[in-house]
């Protein structure tokens, strides 16, 4: 099963990767360039990974948003657009953009998310400490789409202990498709991600580099950042409920008890 992809930038296509709900597109725009589209049956989260742009839509307009040079330079800006909404994104500087789509049945209000809205959480402990910036968390008014960004310092683990969300058994776990879209702070850097099911029907380990994407259709999916390189990934999720409930791999759940303190390098951005 192919789970590692390098999305084609500026293709104009929504890549579904075999998912029922999620879709994804990547754009890199020069000043003055633009992207136009219509959300159709999807709700859409436009995340500015870097740069400054304006967003025009049938549901609202947001001029001159963004500003971080790249994901390691500050907190996120994003725009949420509901189903059946025409839009145009115009770059004011060089822009690095991620378009995260999810099939949706209900229509919600379009919204701008600014750095002041980012809900920063320092999760885990010891060398499994990481930073999570909430963009569209479960309490965000949307139908299915969930989006967060995660920073893992050099040598640290994240999505750890390994967890999964492939069974609808609330409140402990819900069934979610997930995408990991990566940025690394230096060109030679990489992360290692493993995706495996309890019965090892899926058991794959990947070396992931800047601009690559991992699909998580099911199973556990831990990540480790190579020593010397800070790792960022954008998570888009959608599924059976507006929740991020997940269950740990019981073989590794004990490590939580060993976490005495947080990694002082975090937060990496603020």
Feature roles, as predicted:
Residues 5-36, 43, 128-179:
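A short glycine-rich, His/Asp/Glu-containing loop-to-beta-strand
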Residues 25-26, 31-90:
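Extended, compositionally biased flexible segments
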Residues 83, 91, 99-103, 136-137, ...:
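Short, structured patches in soluble enzyme cores that scaffold and shape functional sites
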Residues 66, 100, 108-111, 171, ...:
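A short, polar/proline- and glycine-enriched secondary-structure boundary/capping micro-motif
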Residues 11-13, 21-23, 31, 39-40, ...:
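Residues that act as N-cap/strand-start positions at coil-to-secondary-structure junctions
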Residues 95-137, 194-196, 234-270:
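Double-stranded beta-helix
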Residues 40-63, 81, 154-155, 166-213, ...:
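Glycine- and acidic-residue-biased ligand/ion/polar-headgroup-sensing regions
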Residues 70-108, 209-210, 218-247:
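Ligand-binding loop in jelly-roll beta-barrel domains
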């Amino acid at each position: 099963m192919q789970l590692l992809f390098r999305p084609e930038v500026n293709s104009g296509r929504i890549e579904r990767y075999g998912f029922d709900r999620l879709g994804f597109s990547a754009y890199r725009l020069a000043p003055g360039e633009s992207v136009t589209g219509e959300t159709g049956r999807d709700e859409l989260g436009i995340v500015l990974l870097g740069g400054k742009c304006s967003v025009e839509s049938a549901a609202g307009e947001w001029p001159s948003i963004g500003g971080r040079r790249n994901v390691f330079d500050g907190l996120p800006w994003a725009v949420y657009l509901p189903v059946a909404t025409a839009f145009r994104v115009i770059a004011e500087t060089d822009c690095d953009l991620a378009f995260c789509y999810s099939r949706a049945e209900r229509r919600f209000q379009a919204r701008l998310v600014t750095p002041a809205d980012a809900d920063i959480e320092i999760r885990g402990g010891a060398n499994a400490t990481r930073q999570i910036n909430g963009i569209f968390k479960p309490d965000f008014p949307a139908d299915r789409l969930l989006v967060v960004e995660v920073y893992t310092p050099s040598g640290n683990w994240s999505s750890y202990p390994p967890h999964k969300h492939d069974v609808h058994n609330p409140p402990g776990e819900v069934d979610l498709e997930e995408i990991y879209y990566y940025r690394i702070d230096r060109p030679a850097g990489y992360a290692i991600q493993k995706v495996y099911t309890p019965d090892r029907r899926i058991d794959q380990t990947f070396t992931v580099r800047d601009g690559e994407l991992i699909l998580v259709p099911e199973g556990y999916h831990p990540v480790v950042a190579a020593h010397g390189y800070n790792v960022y990934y954008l998570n888009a999720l959608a599924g059976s409920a507006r929740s991020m409930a997940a269950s740990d791999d019981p073989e590794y759940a004990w490590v939580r008890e060993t976490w005495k303190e947080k990694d002082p390098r975090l937060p990496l951005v603020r």
